[in-house]
């Protein structure tokens, strides 16, 4: 019998492997991305303190009336997180794609964040 591969389990193993070498500091915090079937979430984290500095997602009040494809909304979340980070004085980050492939919604979020001033 053929067993079905649990894609989320594989993603979590990949994410744990990457996180062992990747950490955010106060000077260069970590931009973490989580993707569900319907929404995308991004947060900038200082791992030394264990504190979320800035967050943005498609469930924020700013996105209540937004329409468009999931890729377009992801790029708008990237813009929002970059603007919120700039308000807090954060310009350099470490990008944590959360074990997802750098493609589609994750890539759109990262590109929009770069275009709006975040360096990684």
From Swiss-Prot:
SUPFAM superfamilies on file: Translational machinery components
Keyword vocabulary terms for this entry: Ribonucleoprotein, Ribosomal protein, RNA-binding, rRNA-binding
Entry keyword Ribosomal protein: yes
GO cellular component: cytosolic large ribosomal subunit
NCBIfam families assigned to the protein according to its UniProt record, in alphabetical order: L18_bact (TIGR00060)
Species this protein is from: Staphylococcus carnosus (strain TM300)
Molecular function via GO: 5S rRNA binding; structural constituent of ribosome
Protein family membership: Belongs to the universal ribosomal protein uL18 family.
GO biological process: translation
Protein name (record): Large ribosomal subunit protein uL18
Function: This is one of the proteins that bind and probably mediate the attachment of the 5S RNA into the large ribosomal subunit, where it forms part of the central protuberance.
Self-association state and partner proteins as the record states: Part of the 50S ribosomal subunit; part of the 5S rRNA/L5/L18/L25 subcomplex. Contacts the 5S and 23S rRNAs.
InterPro entries from the UniProt entry: Ribosomal_uL18_bac-type, Ribosomal_uL18_bac/euk
């Amino acid at each position: 019998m053929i067993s079905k591969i649990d894609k989320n389990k594989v993603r979590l193993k990949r994410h744990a492997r990457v996180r062992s070498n990747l950490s955010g500091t106060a000077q260069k915090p970590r931009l973490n991305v989580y993707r569900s079937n319907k929404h995308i979430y991004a947060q900038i984290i200082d791992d030394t303190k264990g504190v979320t500095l800035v967050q943005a997602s498609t469930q924020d009040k700013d996105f209540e009336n937004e329409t468009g494809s999931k890729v377009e909304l992801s790029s708008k979340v990237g813009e929002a997180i970059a603007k919120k980070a700039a308000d807090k004085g954060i310009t350099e980050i470490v990008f944590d794609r959360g074990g997802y492939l750098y493609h589609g919604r994750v890539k759109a979020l990262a590109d929009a964040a770069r275009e709006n001033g975040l360096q990684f």
